[in-house]
């Protein structure tokens, strides 16, 4: 299993229109392979849309993307400022991208580690993840395979911003999270953003 995250930076004021055009062609596209999630940024880099596509393999991705689909890709090129694509491999404890109502606000956190550190991260997290997911749902966790390397991505769902604050505070206060252990000095950089699901997002 691989998961592709496609992030498009759009011109200011164009996100709503881009989402409408994306939705118009989506029914035909998802006959080829399912959409995992679709968000737009609320806090962090603005005017971005993030669409997530799970595939069984790189070969399955190539086949799906080479299949002709009526009305696809959506007619949003006029809005696009920048496009990036990154492919992740889910951690053993990561949920699958399946339709679910997990919350109205999602936090995407990406951590850059020193080369070779990700295996240790997975081991450390696996010991603490159940206690953390009792507080709020984990939507995804995985490491980068193509694109920027040594990236650890984890996505958490919350009812709203206030719930996020309260849950994260409780996790820290009760010693539930962040996970303890691991090798010090491996984490190099942390970035987060808050995103909101589009009306048609399977994960919402």
Say what each PLM segment does:
Residues 96, 114-115, 162:
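A short, structured loop/turn motif at beta-sheet edges
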Residues 20-24, 123-127, 131:
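A non-catalytic, amphipathic alpha-helix used as a structural packing/dimerization or gating element
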Residues 1-58:
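The feature marks the first
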Residues 33-50, 70-105, 127-130, 135-153, ...:
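Glycine-rich beta-strand-turn "strand-cap" elements at beta-sheet edges
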Residues 4-5, 105-113:
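N-terminal beta-strand motif that seeds the catalytic metal site of vicinal oxygen chelate
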Residues 12-14, 114-117:
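Short acidic-aromatic low-complexity motifs
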Residues 8, 53-56, 111-112, 153, ...:
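Extracellular/lumenal glycan-associated surfaces
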Residues 16-20, 56-68, 119-123, 160-173:
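Short amphipathic alpha-helices within nucleic acid-binding modules
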């Amino acid at each position: 299993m691989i998961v592709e995250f496609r992030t498009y930076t759009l011109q200011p004021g164009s996100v709503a229109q881009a989402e409408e055009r994306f939705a118009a062609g989506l029914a035909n596209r998802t006959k080829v392979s399912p959409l995992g999630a679709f968000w737009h940024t609320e806090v962090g880099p603005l005017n971005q849309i993030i669409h997530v596509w799970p595939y069984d393999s790189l070969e399955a991705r190539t086949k799906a993307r080479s299949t002709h689909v009526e009305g696809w890709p959506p007619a949003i090129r006029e809005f696009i400022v920048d496009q990036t694509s990154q492919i992740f491999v889910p951690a053993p404890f990561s949920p699958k991208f399946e339709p679910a109502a997990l919350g109205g606000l999602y936090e995407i956190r990406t951590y850059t580690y020193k080369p070779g550190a990700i295996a240790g991260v997975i081991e450390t997290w696996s010991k603490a993840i159940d206690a953390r997911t009792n507080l709020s749902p984990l939507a995804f966790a995985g490491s980068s395979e193509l694109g920027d390397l040594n990236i650890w991505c984890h996505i958490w769902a919350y009812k709203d911003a206030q719930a996020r604050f309260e849950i994260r505070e409780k996790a820290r206060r009760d010693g539930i999270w962040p996970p303890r252990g691991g090798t010090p000095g491996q984490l190099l950089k942390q970035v987060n953003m808050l995103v909101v699901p589009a009306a048609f997002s399977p994960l919402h």
